């Protein structure tokens, strides 16, 4: 496993991984915001009263 870090610079690899995960989280949240069920910004109640 240590030979992997001889091929890649650990700082650049961890920065790239962090940037990728941040962008992935943004994409997931924007997809959730585009649905009616998970759009928490519109102000609609989550569960309608019976």
From Swiss-Prot:
Keywords associated with the record: Antenna complex, Bacteriochlorophyll, Cell inner membrane, Cell membrane, Chlorophyll, Chromophore, Light-harvesting polypeptide, Magnesium, Membrane, Metal-binding, Transmembrane, Transmembrane helix
Segments in the Periplasmic topological domain: 34-50
Residues that bind a bacteriochlorophyll: 29
Primary location group: membrane
GO annotation, biological process: photosynthesis, light reaction
GO cellular component: organelle inner membrane; plasma membrane; plasma membrane light-harvesting complex
Lineage top rank: taxon: Bacteria
Topological region Cytoplasmic: 1-12
Transmembrane segments: 13-33
Subcellular location: Cell inner membrane
Coiled-coil segments: none
Disulfide bonds: none
Topology in the lipid bilayer: Single-pass type II membrane protein
Sample GO molecular function, one term: electron transporter, transferring electrons within the cyclic electron transport pathway of photosynthesis activity
Family annotation (PROSITE patterns): ANTENNA_COMP_ALPHA
Pfam families found in the cross-reference section: LHC
InterPro entries: Antenna_a/b, Antenna_alpha, Antenna_alpha_CS, Light-harvesting_complex
Family: Belongs to the antenna complex alpha subunit family.
UniProt function note: Antenna complexes are light-harvesting systems, which transfer the excitation energy to the reaction centers.
NCBIfam families referenced in this protein's UniProt entry, alphabetically: pufA_517_ASD
Subunit-level organization: The core complex is formed by different alpha and beta chains, binding bacteriochlorophyll molecules, and arranged most probably in tetrameric structures disposed around the reaction center. The non-pigmented gamma chains may constitute additional components.
Record-given protein name: Light-harvesting protein B-880 alpha chain
């Amino acid at each position: 496993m240590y030979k992997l870090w001889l091929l890649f610079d650990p700082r650049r690899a961890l920065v790239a991984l962090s940037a990728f995960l941040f962008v992935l989280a943004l994409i997931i949240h924007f997809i959730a915001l585009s649905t009616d069920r998970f759009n928490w910004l519109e102000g609609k109640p989550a569960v309608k009263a019976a």
